[in-house]
C-alpha cells in the first residue's frame, strides 16, 4: 500500500489489478485502503477463497474478480497500476506476452510492481535441494530440480496433516528469467 502511494509515482486512486491474486491478501488490503481493485487469477478455487474473505470483511461489492490466464488477459478498460506478488510471473512460460498484456491495459504513466525469483535463487538456493518443515499439525517436504537447459525449476510439495491423515501433493515449475529480460 505505501509502496504504491508513496513510492510508485504517487498512485493514489484509479483502478488497480492484482495479477495472479491467489487467495487475495493483497487485493483485499488494497481494497480496504480505498483502491478500486480487480483480482485476477486462473484458479477458480483461489477466487472462491477471495470471495469468501471479501464477504467476511464486507468488501464484496467493492472489487471485481476475474478468472483469466495472464497470457490471454482481457480487461474491460484501463488500469492505473498492476501488482503481482509471490513470484506469479516465474510461473508463466512466456514472460514477454504476459508483461505486454498488462501493459496494453495500463494507463499512460501507470505502474507495474511485481516480484520474481532470480536466476541465482533458482540455481543456488532451490537448485536440486530438498527442504523439510515440521510443525505440530503438519509436515512438509519441498523438493526441487533445476533444469538448466530449459531454465526452470521443477518443484514438488508434499504436506501430511498429522491429525486428519490427509495428504496434499502438488507439482509445478518456475521459469528463470535474466534481469535483462525482465527490464
Regions found by a protein language model. Give the residues of each.
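Conserved class I S-adenosyl-L-methionine
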Residues: 13-20
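Conserved SAM/SAH-binding loop
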Residues: 23
Amino acid at each position: 500500500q505505501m509502496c504504491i502511494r508513496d513510492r510508485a509515482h504517487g498512485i493514489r486512486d484509479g483502478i488497480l489489478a492484482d495479477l495472479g491474486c491467489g487467495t487475495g491478501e493483497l487485493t483485499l488490503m488494497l481494497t480496504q485502503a480505498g483502491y478500486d481493485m480487480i483480482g485476477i487469477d486462473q484458479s477458480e478455487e483461489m477466487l472462491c477463497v477471495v470471495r469468501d474473505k471479501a464477504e467476511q470483511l464486507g468488501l464484496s461489492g467493492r472489487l471485481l474478480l476475474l478468472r483469466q490466464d495472464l497470457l490471454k488477459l482481457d480487461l474491460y478498460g484501463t488500469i492505473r497500476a498492476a501488482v503481482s506478488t509471490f513470484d506469479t510471473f516465474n510461473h508463466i512460460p512466456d514472460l514477454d506476452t504476459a508483461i505486454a498484456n498488462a501493459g496494453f491495459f495500463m494507463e499512460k504513466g501507470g505502474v507495474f510492481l511485481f516480484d520474481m525469483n532470480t536466476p541465482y535463487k533458482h540455481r543456488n538456493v532451490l537448485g536440486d535441494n530438498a527442504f523439510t518443515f515440521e510443525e505440530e499439525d503438519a509436515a512438509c517436504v519441498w523438493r526441487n530440480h533445476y533444469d538448466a537447459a530449459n531454465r526452470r525449476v521443477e518443484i514438488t510439495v508434499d504436506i501430511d496433516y498429522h491429525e486428519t491423515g490427509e495428504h496434499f501433493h502438488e507439482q509445478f515449475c518456475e521459469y528463470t528469467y535474466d534481469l535483462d529480460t525482465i527490464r
